[in-house]
A protein has these predicted regions:
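Conserved catalytic cores of phosphodiester-cleaving nucleases, focusing on short active-site segments
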Residues: 433, 455-472, 486
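Structural motif
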Residues: 148, 464-466, 500
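A short acidic/basic microdomain associated with nuclease active sites
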Residues: 436-450
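Short beta-strand or tight-loop elements
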Residues: 451-455, 497
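Phosphate-binding site recognition
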Residues: 1-425, 440
């Protein structure tokens, strides 16, 4: 069995530790060169959790501390000549989660203390904003060089309570106070870098820093974090080959599997494909493809929001949106779309420059399967053993193209769903239908547009395309007739596959499928 060529820094986010210990590092220092050449002073970057933000922040810290030896052989080594040593204040707020006001104040106190030990503290500096301002000014005075402030995961203290107004207000006031000196400290600052997941406009960062560059949606920074397809197929190719060998695949087959599981992120209109770095590195190191990112912890705030806004997973694929509908503050949102995008559960799939319209979708199989697993208890039987038994029989029927048997399995299973989990809308049954088929890893799309309407679901099999129409308390014949009347089959006539239309009737009283009609087109 082929050996792993690269030594991967699994769980390590400190640049100096990676470089000093010979761990594999994908050079991202060209982006620091770009910052310096453009004389950028305040930069904000939004990316999902575990996507490399902290490593990039650590890289910036090492650069501004003038640690030239760590950058030998990297892009910035050819650019930087002076390697000035600036005082760097690096605040990591990722640990400030699930806190009340007292705990958050204590956390900020512990973050400030090391710098006060280094640069001193004056009487009267009591509140975090006063202490931060004093530290920066003294650091500048004592070293003769402007300070650098790095704030990693600036929004972490607020995300878990974003849906709880009473709890959010006191925490937001504390963080607003902490960040408030940044604007007036401009004469003492060389650079300020802030990372997070979403935007809280009232935290003074966005409302007061007029020269803040939010690079989150810029094409040139789309791969500032994460791993691009080019980086995988060049620097990491030997280990992808080794993974393929371990899994009994060719390199091309392994690359396809890695792409399906971990690729698909796009952070701008013309973004290159970006792989989830956490999952990709874990997979190459462990020689196993698994849901590492999703399995590392779905944020509780996300599940609460999915519940609050009654998210229909079926509607997330192919969601059309203008920029302001997903690039907005979580405090201003009226649905879950902004947070789903900013948290990495949706990504940009397509951009129409004429209408400035984005098409959003779930990035890859890891995220899709993870969302399905998280949401299915809200729609079907919470008992995992019952779900597994049903899915096994259902799966076998679908894969042998026996839709009759598959729907019979579904009818029996749906009758067991607890009544209190249900509502009786057509959307609800459509979502259950979508969840069932999606678990089989079949390519299924819901509400697919035709020239004069939308099919409820389209399922692509190797030799057959199924078009489904679902009706609640109406006949299966009516559902079948709508497929013909609306021309739902027309887009697929040129594909050379067998075309089958399926009309399904749900009985809201019996809480299951009452009838279906299957007809080849």
């Amino acid at each position: 069995m082929a050996k792993i060529v690269n030594k991967y820094p699994v769980g390590i986010q400190t640049f100096s530790k990676i470089r000093e210990n010979g761990y594999f590092y994908i050079d991202k220092t060209q982006f620091i060169v770009d910052f310096r050449e453009k004389q950028m002073s305040y930069v904000f970057l939004s990316r999902p959790r575990r996507f490399g933000k902290s490593l990039f922040a650590s890289t910036l810290q090492a650069y501004f501390e003038g640690r030239k030896e760590l950058f030998e052989g990297l892009a910035i080594a050819d650019y930087e000549k002076e390697w000035v040593k600036h005082p760097v204040l690096h605040f990591d707020l990722s640990g400030a989660k699930h806190f009340d006001a007292d705990a958050l104040n204590n956390y900020l106190n512990l973050e400030l203390l090391p710098y006060e030990e280094l640069y001193g503290k004056r009487e009267g500096e009591i509140y975090p904003n006063e202490r931060l301002e004093g530290i920066v000014k003294r650091a500048y005075k004592q070293t003769g060089e402007k300070a650098v402030v790095i704030i990693d995961e600036y929004d972490a203290p607020l995300l878990d309570v974003v849906h709880e107004k009473e709890n959010l207000q006191p925490l937001r006031r504390i963080m607003q106070n902490f960040y408030s000196p940044l604007k007036k400290l401009d004469p003492y600052l060389e650079f300020c870098f802030i990372t997070g997941i979403t935007k809280f406009p009232q935290l003074s960062i966005f409302s007061e820093l007029n020269n803040l560059d939010n690079i989150s949606l810029f094409d040139q920074y789309s791969a500032i974090c994460g791993i691009s397809k080019t980086e995988l197929t060049t620097q990491m190719k030997p280990d992808a080959e080794a993974l393929g060998e371990a899994l009994g695949m060719t390199y091309e087959e392994c690359l396809k599997e890695l792409t399906q599981f971990y690729d698909g992120y796009h952070f701008s209109e013309k973004s290159e494909d970006v792989f989830n770095p956490f999952s990709l590195v874990k997979a190459l190191n462990a020689r196993k493809i698994a849901p590492y990112w999703f399995g590392s912890g779905t944020p509780s705030f996300l599940l609460k929001l999915l519940d609050k806004y009654h998210v229909n997973l079926a509607s997330l694929e192919g969601q059309e949106a203008v920029l302001s509908s997903f690039d907005q503050s979580t405090e201003e949102m009226t649905d879950a779309l902004p947070l789903l995008y900013q948290s990495g559960y949706l990504t940009i799939k397509k951009y129409d420059p004429m209408f400035r319209e984005y098409t959003l979708g779930i990035p890859n199989k890891e995220v899709r399967d993870g969302l399905l697993n998280s949401l299915i208890p809200h729609y079907v039987n919470p008992r995992r053993s019952d779900n597994d038994a049903f899915l096994l029989g259902f799966c076998k029927a679908v894969y042998r193209n026996d839709i009759e048997a598959a729907l019979e399995h579904m009818r029996t299973y749906m009758a067991t769903i607890p009544y209190d989990l249900e509502n009786h809308s057509e959307k609800h049954y459509q979502t259950i239908f979508y969840l069932m088929f999606s678990f089989l890893n079949i390519y299924i799309r819901t509400e697919v547009k035709s020239a004069i309407g939308r099919a409820d679901a389209v399922m692509h099999m190797p030799d057959t395309i199924y078009v489904f129409e679902l009706k609640v308390d109406k006949s299966a014949e009516e559902a079948l007739a709508q497929i013909d009347e609306k021309g739902y089959m027309l887009p697929y006539h040129a594909e050379g596959k067998r075309l089958v239309k399926v009309g399904i009737s749900f009985d809201s009283t019996q809480r299951t499928i009452s009838d279906w009609k299957i007809k080849e087109d």
